[in-house]
């Protein structure tokens, strides 16, 4: 069984308030949790990305770290990019994950832009011992 584990989410929200906005003002922990929930809607797609990468390297382990912005006006995840200094996985896997999460939308939108870093750690399943 192959596993992928969501490793961490670091989230910093800017403190700009938009007057007349019908959006909410989440505290940092709620913003973090809500963003994590949106990203987790793509867990199957991200697992599929890893499964495709395993066809090239059945022992593939690694971490993909993605940075992005949550736009205050739309709640949309934008400017999604791999943190190459912290990512230890093939480019094809990283690109697939970026494509999976880019454009997701946090609803309801927040009064603040958010800057986030999210990491996925992948570990290939140990082969079953021969009987």
Feature map (PLM): residue ranges:
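Charge-biased low-complexity segments
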Residues: 20-131
